[in-house]
Swiss-Prot record:
Tissue: Mostly expressed in juvenile and adult leaves, to a lower extent, in flower tissues, and, at low levels, in roots and stems.
Residues recorded as bearing Phosphoserine in the entry: S446, S480
Keyword line: Membrane, Phosphoprotein, Sugar transport, Transmembrane, Transmembrane helix, Transport, Vacuole
GO terms assigned for molecular function: kinase binding; transmembrane transporter activity
Membrane topology: Multi-pass membrane protein
Disordered as annotated region, ranges: 351-403
Keyword NAD in record: no
Gene that encodes the chain: MSSP1
Name of protein: Monosaccharide-sensing protein 1
Amino acid sequence: MKGATLVALAATIGNFLQGWDNATIAGAMVYINKDLNLPTSVQGLVVAMSLIGATVITTCSGPISDWLGRRPMLILSSVMYFVCGLIMLWSPNVYVLCFARLLNGFGAGLAVTLVPVYISETAPPEIRGQLNTLPQFLGSGGMFLSYCMVFTMSLSDSPSWRAMLGVLSIPSLLYLFLTVFYLPESPRWLVSKGRMDEAKRVLQQLCGREDVTDEMALLVEGLDIGGEKTMEDLLVTLEDHEGDDTLETVDEDGQMRLYGTHENQSYLARPVPEQNSSLGLRSRHGSLANQSMILKDPLVNLFGSLHEKMPEAGGNTRSGIFPHFGSMFSTTADAPHGKPAHWEKDIESHYNKDNDDYATDDGAGDDDDSDNDLRSPLMSRQTTSMDKDMIPHPTSGSTLSMRRHSTLMQGNGESSMGIGGGWHMGYRYENDEYKRYYLKEDGAESRRGSIISIPGGPDGGGSYIHASALVSRSVLGPKSVHGSAMVPPEKIAASGPLWSALLEPGVKRALVVGVGIQILQQFSGINGVLYYTPQILERAGVDILLSSLGLSSISASFLISGLTTLLMLPAIVVAMRLMDVSGRRSLLLWTIPVLIVSLVVLVISELIHISKVVNAALSTGCVVLYFCFFVMGYGPIPNILCSEIFPTRVRGLCIAICAMVFWIGDIIVTYSLPVLLSSIGLVGVFSIYAAVCVISWIFVYMKVPETKGMPLEVITDYFAFGAQAQASAPSKDI
């Protein structure tokens, strides 16, 4: 995790520069207006030029990043920041200033669009939300430091707006250095181009270990778009006998053998009888079919069912049920029992076509304790001894004893990795094709119910879990395994972005979520308020609060703005802690009402004049409250969601669409705010923003699913499954 965290920190310097510039232009506009005597419409244009540049670059940044990679686009962003800083330092007139702001928009557009994508593609699922909150934290940190600089310069007799804006070139040099010499390319992008050796090395750097077999398998599977998907309710147990070498993986009793992405084990799974699956599959299908609200998207309930009553992330979450899930992608010499003898040879022919030493090191299981934190939490297991009446042995109730025994099944003290977030991936060969299984253990209550009430579990004693599986055809295609089984990734991605993929049901549903939340975020007014905070606070009378300090109204507004951004930082830290615990959806549903209340109180304080001091205090307090709760939820989460919900092959294209909507909305809000302030005043402006926040809460409740802790590939598959299942289902049932 250390490698992924450092890479995320380096990438988010681009967001630091964006935050720095947002605050700097807000402060510099006061002096630009005085120096150049600009009309109101031109004031908005100076600010909006960076937004125009961001919109222009965003329209092509996604497809280009799918073609050239994420890293080159981040390098270009750093170059744009550096050049625009130098030009703004020189700007002799408003025309040159507007050109510099346009270049600034190019840099900001690339950073805001691609940094969340880059982090999502390099971060483990367990901390992806936390790391993707770093752009908000560094952006707000950049704003705070910039306001400190602007406030200090405002105390001088003749502040220079050119110097304020030109300082941007200094931190942009650090960003340029890190993007060129430190940041690796996204491993998911590398896999999509068939550059398996490079992807493996990057994953090893990010994870801090040699064994990245599971991650490599998952990234290859992520190249798939669409395809038929089903859900199954399974009981899964460790295979404790030597299997044969045949490819048949289903016996006459319906018991399946699953091979996975790691070495030394295979597993047996059998479907849970339909009458006993109410805790798992049936409830999830019901979540798609039976809606308490007509307009509520069934996907919201489907995703929610995956997070209900899940095992806690803390504590010892290692598993004995999925310690070394077979090995399909490992190429070590010792093949596990029960696996087809030529299985690994077929996979090796693909993975090693450019590098003969791709084989996973067996020593990965002997890593020291410092490496344990790099491993994803695995399924906890239930160990039970059942008689013919399915009554559990008294000792089966001890979770502690169950987990203590979990490592004994393997003969060592280490568990292998899943694919992240407690998810696991298995494979079954059937009818000349491979089936891929994404497995997730049901919650504690579901497991307890399965032990007591599900007949047909593993006969006799044994260990098993009650798991739900999302099943689809693997990219290990329908060819004979005696030949080349895998469709090479470079052939899958050779055609570049697939515009036709935008018509896939899952992609369309994800676009509705991504575009909708980006539009509503902008029309909640945050960027307009940020750009014009000094003017807004000055009009609200904040100089009264700081008159005893002998500050001018302009300096006082800068100081209040700086203090506001300072208070935002601990709020973002709280959001970082909660992003992978409470989840994205929950944070939005809890923070948006606070935005509404703060805007309503701000409107009331403008309508009812108590005293100048009280009104100034209310206005300032509401602005601070609005900012703090915005950066906890509505600030980072739209970009986080958009970077998670699209398939790898079209992620750049879909992100470009969402980002273009983001920047167009930003332009409209920013350019219209000065006009609105002069026509309908603060009361009208913030009344509109409050109404949009109400609409936003309804949209989140109805349409936005929870994605915390889920691998990107699993998220996109569930979008596809949910959309397909709903489309093919009768109106009342699936």
